Amino acid sequence: MRVDVGGGVRLFVDVDGAGWIPEGQSMRQRPTLLMLHGGPAMDSSLFRGSGLDELTDVAQVVVYDHRGAGRSDWRSPQEWTLDTWADDVVRLCDVLGIVKPIVLGSSFGGMVAQRYLARHPGHPDRVVLAGTSARLDLDLVAACFAARGGDRAGAVAQQYLAGDQSLAADYDELCLPLYAIEPVEAERFARVIANPDLDAHFTKEWNAMDLRSGLAQVTCPVLVIGGELDPICPLEAVRDVANALPPGLVRIIELQGASHLEAAADDIAPFVRDFILESSQSQS
């Protein structure tokens, strides 16, 4: 379904699992897990079949496509900013009546979640930041691509991520396969409704952003997950995120032998499930 979040902007939303379940003579409300997809030019179909689908046994799962992506309204590039996407989380929750969501931000979605935490620190119950970074360290990322895919992959990554769109095809050929340990079935990406203009537009903000200062004011528990072999969000960058968060609220999990897709979605469901079950909402 498409939901109007204000200003005539419609976001595509999909809901799995019951929000209320019978418990004796009454009904108990379950936590809501709101999942923010990566890309940014991808869509929420990337979560399907990742294992995160199975979390409906502990929460109502809500996925949506960001403004500018997938089945949501694409709108004007002037609206494709982290501030807008972060505020869309709150707008969507207001419309759907979601209070104190558990927010999972994957890859680019984790950048949105970090900005959301900075702008709306009291809004979530808890947050998962999976396979994401607070800033783009081009030299580090290029070195990681080179280590896994050779010097050419490293050079292409450095130039493409800096904004050279003429290397998009080379990046897709040499670098994207390194996002996973095992080959990814072609159908997974074929299902995505891609907006390549969104990637090109966000590259400017990505190269300039540094989200670390906004994480200092976080007031809820945060689970940070990274992959040992992730070239686009290396473990050093994941640790950078964790170190920017208040020590008493952050927990970090480093997945050995995992690349980006594994750390951002495919292998994280057991850790997310435990994190949900720790929520006061699950215990009420």
How does the language model describe each region?
Residues 6-74, 78, 92:
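Conserved HGGG/HGGXW glycine-rich cap/lid loop of the alpha/beta-hydrolase fold
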Residues 83-101:
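Conserved acidic catalytic loop of the alpha/beta-hydrolase fold
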Residues 110-121, 127:
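Short glycine-enriched nucleophile-adjacent loop
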Residues 127-159:
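Flexible "cap/lid" loop of the alpha/beta hydrolase fold
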Residues 158-213, 220, 240:
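Alpha/beta-hydrolase
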Residues 231-237:
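Conserved alpha/beta-hydrolase "acid-adjacent" motif
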Residues 248-284:
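Catalytic active-site module of serine/aspartate enzymes centered on a nucleophile-bearing elbow/loop
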